[in-house]
């Protein structure tokens, strides 16, 4: 539905027995297949951003499925990527980063098994609230060149589609 974050949710929907009601999920607006189509069939994802592909082409079977679902992939919009959500923000180490609230660099990001970061040209991993540790590295960006850094609070807010005028108070870990 256009959010630059992979989120899995469970919905419980109920109605009183005396009410004649029907419910269905909203019609999807975006799809992973449409993003893959733009990356690997037309190349428009990379071209529109002035980039060379930063990921491996999917295996032949996956590519065939993407091509065979062409009609569906043209109807739905591509998933919004982490890159798309933060592309107009400067690197948090650049002096111009101070122009954006809560856009402060945090040192120390590093990958280890099971702690891999979010791929820049995919939607972000689900960001979790709280100071419970970060087992999957979802608060890190995995750059195509093999480097990593933590998302700033502002970048995390962008991924969750908070407006830029929202001010977050407290320590970075809160």
Predicted regions and their residues:
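C-terminal target-recognition/interaction regions appended to catalytic cores
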Residues: 80-174
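Class I S-adenosyl-L-methionine
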Residues: 1-120
């Amino acid at each position: 539905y256009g959010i630059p974050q992979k989120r899995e949710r469970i919905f419980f929907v109920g109605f009183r027995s005396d009410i004649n009601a029907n419910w269905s999920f909203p019609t999807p607006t975006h799809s992973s297949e449409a993003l893959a189509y733009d990356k690997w069939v037309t190349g428009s994802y990379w071209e529109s951003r002035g980039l060379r592909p930063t990921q491996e082409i999917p295996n032949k079977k996956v590519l065939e499925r993407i091509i065979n679902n062409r009609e569906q992939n043209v109807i739905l919009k591509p998933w919004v990527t982490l890159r798309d959500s933060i592309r107009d923000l400067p690197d948090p180490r650049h002096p111009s980063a101070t122009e954006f609230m809560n856009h402060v660099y945090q040192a120390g990001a590093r990958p280890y098994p099971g702690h891999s970061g979010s791929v820049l040209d995919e939607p972000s991993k689900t960001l979790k609230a709280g100071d419970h540790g970060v087992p999957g590295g979802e608060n890190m960006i995995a750059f195509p060149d093999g480097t990593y850094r933590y998302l700033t609070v502002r970048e995390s807010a962008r991924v969750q589609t908070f407006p830029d005028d929202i001010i977050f108070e407290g320590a970075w870990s809160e």
